[in-house]
Amino acid sequence: MLTWLSRTDFDFPPLDKALQEPNGLLAAGGDLNPQRLVAAYRHGCFPWYQDGQPILWWSPDPRTVLFPDELHVSRSLAKCLRQQRFEVTFNHDFRAVIQACAAPRDYADGTWITTPMQLAYQELHLRGIAHSVEVWQERQLVGGLYGLAMGRLFFGESMFSRADNASKVGFVTLVRHLRDAGFVLIDCQMPTRHLHSLGARAISRGEFADYLQRYRDQPPTGDLDF
């Protein structure tokens, strides 16, 4: 039975209460209050819904993650990185990145990054929790991604690309930066061929919860310098 959250109830049900079909649906309702969003990620779930739907909270099993030491860079991508065709920055234009991620795409109907969602994550950015990666070419924003950093974990949310390899260059740069700072896991949420090509793989929800419990409150061991 699906749990419905009130606007005053910040407690999520145990992860093992998530539905099998649709896979990982844990709860519905509530709001996108920053305190609730932080509680959700700390608990192991995230919001994902379309316009016109109630807020839906998910914890899929299995969970797609990337361990920084398992990052895979293909020969063609390595060549692109060596050519330095792009400039990569952190937290220079969070709003532009999330708006670009929310823009309509040819292969999808609508967007799950609704206006309330954008505003909520911009507030998390102002609080130093959400971060953006920008990829520039000739001073134009051509790719990027955003997500949340908690302890030694990074929770990726979405990425976009307007030039070949732009989002991959941004992602690889981020992963290397997080690895140097002592991060142990990057949550990719759901599987895609794009992420698997970079080394992401599936782990069980229980294993993901173990990493969450162990590392969400541990400070990075190196200089994060976002």
From Swiss-Prot:
Its EC number is 2.3.2.6. The gene is aat. It catalyses: N-terminal L-lysyl-[protein] + L-leucyl-tRNA(Leu) = N-terminal L-leucyl-L-lysyl-[protein] + tRNA(Leu) + H(+); N-terminal L-arginyl-[protein] + L-leucyl-tRNA(Leu) = N-terminal L-leucyl-L-arginyl-[protein] + tRNA(Leu) + H(+); L-phenylalanyl-tRNA(Phe) + an N-terminal L-alpha-aminoacyl-[protein] = an N-terminal L-phenylalanyl-L-alpha-aminoacyl-[protein] + tRNA(Phe). Keywords: Acyltransferase, Cytoplasm, Transferase. InterPro entries: Acyl_CoA_acyltransferase, Leu/Phe-tRNA_Trfase, Leu/Phe-tRNA_Trfase_C, Leu/Phe-tRNA_Trfase_N. One of its GO terms (molecular function) is leucyl-tRNA--protein transferase activity. It comes from Pseudomonas aeruginosa (strain UCBPP-PA14). One of its GO terms (cellular component) is cytoplasm. Gene3D superfamilies: Leucyl/phenylalanyl-tRNA-protein transferase, C-terminal domain, Leucyl/phenylalanyl-tRNA-protein transferase, N-terminal domain. Functions in the N-end rule pathway of protein degradation where it conjugates Leu, Phe and, less efficiently, Met from aminoacyl-tRNAs to the N-termini of proteins containing an N-terminal arginine or lysine. Belongs to the L/F-transferase family. This is Leucyl/phenylalanyl-tRNA--protein transferase. It comes from the Bacteria. One of its GO terms (biological process) is protein catabolic process. HAMAP family: Leu_Phe_trans. The lineage of its organism: Bacteria, Pseudomonadati, Pseudomonadota, Gammaproteobacteria, Pseudomonadales. It is found in: Cytoplasm.
